């Protein structure tokens, strides 16, 4: 995907792995890495990604949220979790592009995250890449269970709904936003997302884009269908 994109001047990541009471933005100049995973080989805890932070962008994000009536705060001590540094290491391995991270809100309310995305429309920052890092299927028990026709059917039904919701140009934006706000009504939604933190980065990205996605990329991971969406 990075090869198809103009190289950004900075990156804003919304990761499924960070929740706070209010939206919180990393604002340090040299973010550390948070190895927030367990049971992996020792090499997984030696990964390095020494990208710079971008305090000016962090302040702009906080101001955009404040102007939309959304209280936010800066955190100059927190580093980047693996929802940020893993995709960034694959996309931009030289680690020269400044990066900041924006938390989810721990209520996990879909409409709140759509509103956060809409607030980010006020950002005035040239060539900013906004990366929603999550998973369109995140039932860990099902990932490691034997694949069955029933599990596959549930997975595919939700993926089809999500692709249509994000990509169907015949939907109006109010219709698209309502479907995402009411995502629990989708086929097998709670089977695919027993907890919704891995879905909500998508809501922030759609709230910012406010249009049908330009591209859908399907992938199979541990036998389960998953989808990624690109807005240009």
Residue ranges and their predicted role:
Residues 36-41, 92-100, 181:
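Short, basic/glycine-rich phosphate-binding loops at helix/coil junctions
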Residues 12-17, 103-105, 131-133:
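Short beta-strand segments
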Residues 60-63, 67, 97-98, 106-108, ...:
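Surface-exposed, charge/polar-rich loops and edge strands
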Residues 44-52, 74, 103-110, 189:
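Flexible, glycine/proline-enriched loop segments at strand-loop-helix junctions
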